[in-house]
């Protein structure tokens, strides 16, 4: 009996994304052995964090790096670093009186980039200053928002989160002209692997990536890369120091697991993985378009604007399903399959997070749902209670 069976928790086929609520990703092959080995010895955590971060910086072609407890923790630490730098007087003031007591405690974000994850900025104590609207941002809006209180500009790349935003190059030029650092939230911007160094080579002062998504390391890890002085300031606030970031602790097993996963990720043929996703997506589309009342199309870029395709599957009104009812029907019974909501009567299917062979039951179950009479949302909801 598996650990999940003992706990009464049902495993899920993930046709959605490397989402936190689904466990992020499955470990890369060498990760478990590396974490087990790391768990067998005590070690100086300062020394281990420094050694792992140095190797991560080398692998990602960055000036410096820091392994944190997920991308959200990276945003907290990055914001703290931009507010205080390595000035221990400011760090002490932050601890005693909060971020509002610091000279720089504001972070600028484009309106179209607002999302639930920017709560990490508030968690650091910073005040968010919003610019533009969901359609556009004019250059003078960024220029006017920057003041002596500005600690950083947070930038989210990609079509999903960058709606109405100024181009990154323009943001970098404007911010740097006023001495303001730019943080790029690239949590889900892998692949391509080149993004690990593209944003910083473009001029970003810090970039944040998840370690538990496409890298396939521990879900509780993330990577901060960028300028050495800011990475050093991040480490002041982080565990094992007694700073505000101490609760966001990364254990020795996670540090080693992340490093090994990153080494593995950079050795993989990303084009081959993309081609596999393309093949499965097209196979789904071909079959589903042969079903009465079902329309399937290719969506690219995919989730979070990444260079991985998805299928958008839409049910005709005559089939009687809403998108939520399709999703619930996919989760109901065996196997349980998680998908993402798209439009009013449509869902996304993502092949990237599937294990070999799982594309078949995904297609089979969706075909079965489309072929049977609509059972009503009430019955579906009751079956999940």
What are these regions (language model features)?
Residues 36-48, 223-224:
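An acidic intrinsically disordered interaction segment
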Residues 3, 287-364, 368:
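Conserved C-terminal alpha-helix-loop-beta "cap" of PLP-dependent enzymes
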Residues 1-27, 50-68, 72-266, 278, ...:
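Conserved PLP-enzyme active-site core in the AAT-like
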Residues 11-21, 30-39, 308-313:
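Generic N-terminal amphipathic, Lys/Arg-enriched alpha-helix
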Residues 45-50, 64-65, 245-249, 268-277, ...:
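Flexible, glycine/charged-enriched surface loops at secondary-structure junctions
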Residues 40, 207, 316:
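Glycine-rich tight-turn/loop motif centered on a GG-T
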Residues 264-270, 347, 352:
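Glycine-rich phosphate/diphosphate-binding loops and the adjacent beta-loop-alpha structural elements
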